[in-house]
C-alpha cells in the first residue's frame, strides 16, 4: 500500500494525556461527581474546540447542566487545570515523527483544539512538533471539528495528496472512523509501540 503522508492528532498522541488529568483530580478534590461532570464535558467540548465558545463558557454550561453552584475561583482553577493537562509532551511520538520525515513521508497535524489554547500553549510548547509538519489544521481556526468530513478534506487539500495516500493517527475511534469515511487510511493510537508496529505492517 502506498502511503505518502502521516497525519497526527494532538491530545493522546502528541501528549501523554487522553483526558485532562488535572481536571479529574480537581473534581475529586472539590467533591464534584465525575460521571456527572464528564457528561457535560463531552456535551460541550467540541463547541469549545471549534472556537464557538470560550473555555469559561464551556465550564459554565457544564455547571448549569449538572445543577452545580460553583464559584468563579473554582471555575478559574478548572480552566487552569484543563490547559495544563494537555501540556504533557509525548517525546516518543516526536521522535517517530522525525524518523518518518527522514524516510520521506510528509507529516500532517489534524487536531480538535481551541484557538486560545493553540495561541497560548500549543504553538510554543509543541513548536518542534509543528516544525515537522508539511500541513496543519487546527479545528478552532476553521470552525469545524473531527469527525466532520470537511476537516479531513481540508488537511488533504493542504498536504496536496490523494486521500488514499494518507494515514491518520488518532486515539479516538470516532475520529479514526471519520478519516476512513473521507477515504483515508487510519490507525487508532493506543501506545507508541503498538502504533509504530501497526504502521510498519500497514505499509508492507
Residue ranges and their predicted role:
Residues 93-140:
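Substrate-recognition/cap helix-loop segment adjacent to the acidic, metal-dependent catalytic center
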Residues 48-94:
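Metal-dependent phosphoesterase signature
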Residues 1-40, 64-65, 181-182:
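Active-site neighborhood of HAD-like aspartate-dependent phosphohydrolases
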Residues 163-200:
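Acidic, Mg2+-coordinating phosphoryl-transfer loop and its flanking beta/alpha structural elements
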Residues 34-36, 131-135, 162-166:
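Short acidic capping loops at alpha-helix termini that bridge into adjacent secondary structure
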Residues 145-173:
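Conserved Lys-Pro-Asp/Glu-containing loop-to-beta segment of HAD-superfamily phosphomonoesterases
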Residues 5, 77-108, 149:
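Short, acidic loop-to-helix structural element flanking the phosphoryl-transfer center
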Residues 9-12, 51, 100, 109, ...:
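Generic structural signal for small/hydrophobic residues in well-ordered secondary structure
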Amino acid at each position: 500500500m502506498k502511503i505518502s503522508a502521516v497525519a497526527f492528532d494532538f491530545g493522546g498522541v502528541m501528549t501523554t494525556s487522553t483526558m485532562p488529568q488535572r481536571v479529574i483530580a480537581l473534581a475529586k478534590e472539590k467533591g464534584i461527581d465525575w460521571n456527572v461532570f464528564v457528561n457535560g464535558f463531552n456535551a460541550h467540548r467540541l463547541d469549545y474546540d471549534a472556537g464557538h465558545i470560550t473555555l469559561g463558557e464551556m465550564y459554565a454550561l457544564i455547571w448549569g447542566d449538572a445543577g452545580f453552584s460553583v464559584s468563579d475561583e473554582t471555575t478559574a482553577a478548572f480552566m487552569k487545570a484543563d490547559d495544563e493537562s494537555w501540556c504533557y509532551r509525548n517525546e516518543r511520538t516526536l521522535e517517530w515523527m522525525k524518523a518518518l520525515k527522514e524516510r520521506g513521508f510528509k507529516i500532517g497535524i489534524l487536531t480538535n483544539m481551541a484557538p486560545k489554547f493553540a495561541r497560548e500553549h500549543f504553538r510554543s510548547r509543541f513548536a518542534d512538533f509543528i516544525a515537522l509538519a508539511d500541513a496543519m489544521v487546527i479545528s478552532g481556526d476553521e470552525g469545524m471539528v473531527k469527525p466532520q468530513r470537511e476537516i479531513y478534506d481540508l488537511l488533504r487539500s493542504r498536504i496536496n495528496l490523494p486521500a488514499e495516500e494518507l494515514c491518520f493517527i488518532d486515539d479516538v475511534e470516532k475520529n479514526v472512523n471519520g478519516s476512513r469515511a473521507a477515504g483515508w487510511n487510519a490507525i487508532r493510537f493506543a501506545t507508541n509501540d503498538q502504533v509504530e508496529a501497526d504502521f510498519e505492517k500497514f505499509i508492507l
